[in-house]
Design a protein with these regions (language model features):
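Short Fe-S-cluster ligation motifs
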Residues: 269-273, 277-319
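Short, Lys/Arg- and Gly-enriched loop/turn segments at beta-strand edges
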Residues: 69-76, 116-126, 271
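A generic structural signal for residues embedded in beta-strands
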Residues: 63, 111-112, 261
């Protein structure tokens, strides 16, 4: 529209630009469903047909509630291409997500950008090859949300996988029934022993291997510290491991540099190169240190001094 107007008057260019801005303002992403899954954890179905049409398991979106809102990266928990909906799971960790938790059906997001990141590498593999593999997924806490669409995709393609879900206590176990419906075997563990068994996801994996289970691949998603210890164990057991990294993100396109990671001898950006990486190559200690630095003004100043304009110096409160 604007290119056609370039041969016309300046007034035409201006009017076309105003129309585009107006159209952007009226396109809102309506929340069709909002429910509380657990303490400080909420699920929402959002009307976003374009994202639903193109997304794949493993990808994420960046949402913004209004003009003054933060840009918040959220993993896609599920999608329905026919209905044109995306399911997201939100955990309250700061002011923006606390505000988001009060949204209800009928409300809308101003921005809902995606799909971002690379799809899970598993969905690009030959189905018959996947059927011959023994795969285990380990989800820690909110990591159950991004694990679910991958396991669901595998189930829909005739691939049975084992799933280990861990949480601090029974009340923080989410999507249990949904996961039961798609997992070959589901193992649940809680830190305090309030549900099924006591222990970490790594304890369950150790026991399964000790019982004679053999795994060709492990996919671990959850807090960085959890993924670190899963990778330490799987390296010892000789199990190749994929992790989904969730560092601080701002633009989701690799421009801000906030999500940089050291993977082997290379610097990667989780938003464009990931979020999945070889867990045995990720420098978790550096990633956790960097994430912690973003949470203080002094830390952000240090990162700006070290990295110049290759990171978002004003970040740190996105979640």
């Amino acid at each position: 529209e604007i290119l056609r107007c370039l041969v016309g008057s300046e007034m035409c260019i201006r009017d076309s630009f105003i129309i585009l801005l107006f159209e952007r303002r009226i396109v809102m992403y309506k929340i069709l469903k909002a429910e509380k899954l657990a303490e400080k954890i909420f699920l929402m179905d959002v009307e976003a047909p374009r994202v639903a049409k193109h997304c794949e398991p493993g990808q994420f979106v960046i949402v913004k509630m209004d003009d003054l809102g933060e840009r918040i990266p959220l993993t896609i928990c599920d999608y329905d291409r026919e209905a044109g909906t995306i399911t997201i799971v939100v955990q309250i960790v700061g002011a923006s997500t606390e505000k988001m938790s009060h949204l209800k059906a009928g409300d809308a997001f101003e921005d809902f950008v995606g799909p971002l990141g690379c799809p899970s590498e598993l969905i690009s593999k030959d189905i018959e090859q996947l059927k011959k593999m023994n795969i285990v997924f380990i989800a820690g806490g909110l990591g159950t949300a991004p694990v679910y669409p991958q396991v669901k995709w595998m189930h829909e393609h005739g691939v049975d996988v084992d799933v280990i879900v861990g949480a601090k206590n029974k009340e923080l176990i989410i999507l249990e029934e949904e996961m039961k419906a798609v997992a070959g075997n589901l193992y649940i563990t809680t830190d305090d022993g309030s549900y099924v068994r006591k222990g970490m996801g790594t304890d369950v994996l150790k026991d399964l291997v000790a019982e004679g289970k053999h795994y060709d691949l492990c996919v671990a998603i959850g807090p960085m510290i959890m993924m670190k210890f899963v990778c330490l164990l799987t390296k010892e057991l000789g199990i190749p491991t994929i992790v989904s990294m969730n560092p601080i993100m701002v633009d989701g396109t690799g421009m801000c540099g906030a999500c940089r990671l050291k993977v082997g001898d290379e610097i990667k950006f989780a938003c464009v190169d990931g979020p999945e990486f070889d867990g045995h190559l990720v420098d978790f200690d550096q990633a956790m240190k960097r994430s912690a630095m973003y949470r203080t003004e002094e830390g952000r100043a240090m990162l700006k001094l070290q990295e110049g304009d290759t990171h978002h110096g004003g970040c740190g409160q996105c979640n």
